[in-house]
Amino acid sequence: RPPPTIPGAPVVGGLLRFLRGPIPLIRAEYARLGPVFTVPILTRRITFLIGPDVSAHFFKSNESDMSQQEVYRFNVPTFGPGVVFDVDYQVRQEQFRFFTEALRANKLRSYVDQMVAEAEEYFSKWGESGTVDLKYELEHLIILTASRCLLGREVREKLFDDVSALFHDLDNGMLPISVIFPYLPIPAHRRRDQARTRLAEIFATIIKSRKASGQSEEDMLQCFIDSKYKNGRQTTESEVTGLLIAALFAGQHTSSITSTWTGAYLLKFQQYFAEAVEEQKEVMKRHGDKIDHDILAEMDVLYRCIKEALRLHPPLIMLLRQSHSDFSVTTREGKEFDIPKGHIVATSPAFANRLPHIFKNPDSYDPDRFAAGREEDKVAGAFSYISFGGGRHGCLGEPFAYLQIKAIWTHLLRNFEFELVSPFPENDWNAMVVGIKGEVMVNYKRRKLIVDN
């Protein structure tokens, strides 16, 4: 009972369609073949599992049955040697423990203070009124915030321009061709490798300086410096650099993209903007102007607005695993398929998040679908909403991301009126992390919320 295979030239047919865009391919074949189908790409076979009925094994399997390492090894030149997908599962789990420690609630509390301070400083430079590209502004604010919370005070205060330029070269060195040929000697890859070497030198200097002076900071860099493996070994400078790069890559684009989509939808649908503003007034009645971790956690309306933007536009449109054992799946219609070991297995948040049997009017922006009484993502069971992945490999940075986006939009809702003046944006399907095409131009006007006590 093998999955149906898409028709076409057996070697390059699937590759050509895949490179033209995975979402049109998935949309066409889901309609024709159903939620389980195989796409031959060169010598590999990618089997798609679309929807919670068939994707549970993808999310819940042990690493020995379904692994990330082989399919994400293209990240190794970017992250560097000795971290994440360049190490075996046991070491990778220990490194993920370092991430978990760096994202604990007590750490998040200190990060929120830094997020709020960065937002206040950034938007203080805006005038009384004006027109800005919201996408550009939020991209810049989020890299500033990430520099402060993740990379540390030294980078934020003294080396920001240098480090930003180097990360830009790393970023531009991750192209669709990089997934298949990560070491291809092209100019973008050469610039990527040079940037990675220079970043290692910069962070080695900072780490040595911190250790020599005995100073300790409230940032992710410090968490990684202080981390130890179970055998007592300290992290090396190279490992710390690689883990920081991985953290920034995981969070920077995804947060700036989602912040921008959240704003675009709030400005398009004024009833939700009004609800979000009203929520801010209620919060301010209780807490005044103060913003901290616990106060942000009270903002359910804003949370649902962000979550719905992320449902419609997950920046990671495909998740991949390498299958090391045979397994079977059963569709909700009762059809069974056997997937052999050796296949790459894929699912797509961008497509699965819009399945009409899970989400009512799936292409509509409706944050209330997550409100008490509806909770469409829970009614359909686990793995219905997969913008942050799920199961054994759910996104460790989910709480950080929500706090960061909430901190930004809390400040904006309290201090500005907006009007979207460019056409509503579209997805930029050409990017590895799917962002927003073109500018998102908005008029802003400064104002203060008046709260009736």
From Swiss-Prot:
Pfam families: p450. The keyword Lipid metabolism applies. Heme binds at C395. It catalyses: a 14alpha-methyl steroid + 3 reduced [NADPH--hemoprotein reductase] + 3 O2 = a Delta(14) steroid + formate + 3 oxidized [NADPH--hemoprotein reductase] + 4 H2O + 4 H(+). It is an enzyme of class 1 (oxidoreductase). One of its GO terms (biological process) is methylation. Keywords: Heme, Iron, Lipid biosynthesis, Lipid metabolism, Membrane, Metal-binding, Methyltransferase, Monooxygenase, Oxidoreductase, Steroid biosynthesis, Steroid metabolism, Sterol biosynthesis, Sterol metabolism, Transferase. Gene3D superfamilies: Cytochrome P450. It is found in: Membrane. Belongs to the cytochrome P450 family. This is Obtusifoliol 14-alpha demethylase. It comes from Triticum aestivum. The gene is CYP51.
